[in-house]
Amino acid sequence: MNKKIFILLISLFVNFKFFSFERTITHSYEADYRLFPDTAYTEKYIKQLRGKYEVKYCVQSNIIIPKEAAKGYSCEQILKMLDQMGGLDKKCYGVSYIDYRTGERKAYFKKSSYDKNTGILYVKDKTIGGLYLDVSIDTYKQKENTYAISAILNKRPDNFFVRAIKKREAELFILLQETDDSINVYALVQSSSAPIKLKIFQKYVEGAVGGRVREIQNWFSRMICGQ
């Protein structure tokens, strides 16, 4: 068997085996929170997400991780390591993906830093370039521990092709919900800027944004599971 094909099959097997958790993902061209986990704070956060600006594009996904698989970092520990999201040399390979053509792991986020004092997260995306995000983290310790991370764009991207995305009108939202038997990892990206209404272009954007949402989730999952 060709060596590259063999490596690809092994990589995909490991990737799919690990991420065999229940996952749902949706794309919408309006505000859409149908996958938001049912928590005591759901209404609060949906109201916040809906009320900041007119949402014209929204990608959301939810993973349910069985508690017995959670052998890595705790949710609280992960929230202190957001600087590890960018770079293959970071914990759990940062936000990265397996290239289906070569079987190699490649970085979506090439660099990252997080200033806990200012709450600013910087990530260098492989295509978009540098993104600066204002991060706020809410922690709720009750029977079901819940952690909400909001990261809103604090300036327009430098990349010409995404300059239509406005300051404070695009964000990443993560919700981690710990129950007795599972951990929900909910991820959402939304923006007031929608892709051009050409089917081929929309498919490209949906693939690009959906891939990043999925791999952000996968990074949190690897951290939780210690992979």
Question: What is each residue range found by the language model?
Answer:
Residues 134-174:
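Hydrophobic-ligand binding "helix-grip"
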Residues 127-129, 141-143, 153-157, 176-180, ...:
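Beta-strand elements of well-folded, non-transmembrane domains
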Residues 160-165, 192-211:
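A short acidic/glycine-rich loop-to-helix N-cap element
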Residues 214:
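Nucleotide-cofactor and metal-assisted catalytic machinery
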Residues 86-89, 217-227:
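Sec/Tat-exported extracytoplasmic proteins
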Residues 20-129:
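Hydrophobic ligand-binding cavity/cleft-lining segments
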Residues 166-192:
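Compact beta-sheet-dominated globular domain cores
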Residues 4-14:
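Sec-dependent N-terminal signal peptides
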